[in-house]
Amino acid sequence: MAGSQQQQQQQAVSKPTGGKHGNNLPLWGNEKTMNLNPMILTNVLSSPYFKVQLYELKTYHEVVDEIYFKVNHVEPWEKGSRKTAGQTGMCGGVRGVGTGGIVSTAFCLLYKLFTLKLTRKQVMGLITHSDSPDIRALGFMYIRYTQPPPDLVDWYDEFLDDEEELDVKAGGGCVMTVGEMLRSFLTKLEWFSTLFPRIPVPVQKAIDQHMKSRPRKPPQKDEQEEEEEEATAAPAADTGRHGDKRRSRTPRRSPSPRKSQNRSRSRSHHRERHGASFDYELERERDRQRKEREGKDRDRDRDRDRERDRERDRDRRRSRTPDRNAERRRSRSRERRRSRSTSRDKRTERKDRDKDREAESERERSRKKDREHHKDRERSKDKRSKGEGEERRHKDDKEEKKHREEKRSKRSRSRSRDRKHKAERSSKKRSRSGSRSRQEAGEEKNRKRERSHSKDRQHKRSRSKERSHRRESSNERIHARQERPSSESGERTNSVRADSP
């Protein structure tokens, strides 16, 4: 049998990992949740083990080593952390997503593998690992959650008759082979208290047909196993019914590969088969849980009966000892006295406290009054200073306004004076120019008259005298013309001096 297992592993390893898609392994379904139940995923993400310890693991080989040392079952919840026997999914009488229980180490590491985005070669290394069946189980579970349903048969077909055993239940008690586990993966959605991704109906029918064509092979027993079964058959017959119950509750488990020195895949098959399947194991587990619940109910009834017996004993003791009532009365009177004295002390303490509180309140009131008085003084000072400042500003504004008005009046007066001076100067200039023009006109008239008289008187004078006379008249004209511009220039200078301030 060990030789056949090694041949299967060699065939699986020699299977071409490239294929059409190469070494890259496509993911099916939700690429963020790995198609996990929301309750399990929430508990995985909030687990301190996943957030702290697994966060430090960065490589595929580190995660495989962690699986080897930490995983001892492939159930989603730890033992005793979820009180919902026989129920799956989101049911179980609990409300909310995060109320499932303590998520198992196996599922934390399974989601860690999903975060690494495994290649086809790495997945083949998981499902053909020779050190631990738990590593192989997580590899097959990774395929069930992440690969397309039509490809599941191609992945599992070579391992449907694998006889390597592992205990899949938390706390032990459910030993099965790898082949039985894979057949359960293909034919059932339920896995303890969770569900696998649903398989489409046509694909499921094809898988069922394939499983019918691949019936389970009877286990091949070695000679050593037959001898062990014969040796254990005799004491088993003597133990009786109780021994059978004890053996059915805790079926034998193959030795762990971690305790073996050579870590070989050849495991000793110690459990009795007799046609037992995985369904039978589950049914037996449910019976065990039902019996445990019945035992708990019996324990509760026993506790109630014991409590009743204790009450009866107390009543009997009370009836037997009547003196206890007197003693109780005395103790009650003592307690009353003590309570009275304590109450008096408490009253005095309360009075003292009240007095202290009143004195403190009076002090606080006086402090508040002083503060308010001081604030009022400060406010009055501020108001006075503000009023004085406003009055000063008002006076300054008035003075500035008066000064401005005076300046304006002075300017207006100076402007009026300048206008008057200008008008007087212009009138003087006009009068002077008129008088001068009149004088010149009179002089010319006189000259003309003299000329006419001279012409009449001296008509008979000589030409020399006439020439001299003409020269003199011309000289006079020239002299008169020269005097006119000089007089006009003098008047202009005088007017300019008068206009200048």
Curated annotation (Swiss-Prot):
Feature: compositional bias, Basic and acidic residues: 281-328, 342-408, 437-447, 469-491
Biased composition (Polar residues): 492-501
Coiled-coil boundaries: 281-302
Pfam families reported for this sequence: PRP38
Subcellular location: Nucleus
Predominant localisation class: nucleus
Record keywords, A-Z: Coiled coil, mRNA processing, mRNA splicing, Nucleus, Spliceosome
Region feature (Disordered): 1-28, 208-501
Family under the similarity heading: Belongs to the PRP38 family.
PANTHER family from the UniProt entry: PRE-MRNA-SPLICING FACTOR 38A-RELATED
Name this protein carries in UniProt: Pre-mRNA-splicing factor 38B
Organism, scientific name: Danio rerio
